Amino acid sequence: MHFSPALKSGKLLKRYKRFLADIQLEDGTEITLHCPNTGSMRNCLFPGETVWFSTSNNPKRKYAHTWELMTTPTGGLIGIHSGNANALVEEALNKGVITELVGYDSLSREVKYGDENSRIDILLEAAQKPACYIEVKSCTLLEDGQGYFPDAVSLRGQKHLRELMHMASLGHRAVLLFVVQHTDIHSVAPAAHIDPEYANLLKKAVLSGVEVLAYRCEISASEIHLAHACPVRV
């Protein structure tokens, strides 16, 4: 995924009201960005460090600028736009990057499934193969060298694990795919210290036949894409 037009940068001042962030440009001007991340963004906020943002030419938008990347104090980069995760996975699937998920003929997005009124992020289908239901989660929380998900209690995430277990019980292929949008994260684990119920459900899901994958992103100010598989420590 290329950032076009090119991203611009500023220094983070603060994030507030969940969906807003104030930054300061090089000339001292302060502007407000839309923050496209509904999570807590725990350990992803570094006031004074460089942020990268995109700009929309849609005159109907209240906030023309969208926060895309955060630079860490060690020089790493974090993909702030959690909504990019599904598009990154679709792009990677089309290129055959996710080797565990090759060999399917069709890809659909946001298809209704399960028994809790859910929509699957990605559905892969092929003749003479079980359908493959993929839930995509963006992982950005880094603590003591370990990547974790979720970064806050996630009832929605718990529901999705139950849905995946249900699909696996019906004979379908069920996959939980973590998209690691943090260049300093090299493995992913459930955040039992934040959401113990999610961690317990994930263990049950694996025992029920749900596959758990994680892929790291390569991130720069010009592009972001899925690149390499990394371990998941369930």
UniProtKB/Swiss-Prot annotation:
- GO MF term set: DNA binding
What family does this belong to? Belongs to the SfsA family.
The cross-references to Pfam families, in alphabetical order and at most eight, read: SfsA, SfsA_N
Cystine pairs annotated here are none
Question: What name does the UniProt record give this protein?
Answer: Sugar fermentation stimulation protein homolog
Gene name of this polypeptide: sfsA
Name the InterPro entries for this protein: SfsA, SfsA_C, SfsA_N
* Top-level taxon in the UniProt lineage: Bacteria
> Do you know which HAMAP family this protein is assigned to?
SfsA (MF_00095)
PANTHER family according to UniProt:
SUGAR FERMENTATION STIMULATION PROTEIN A
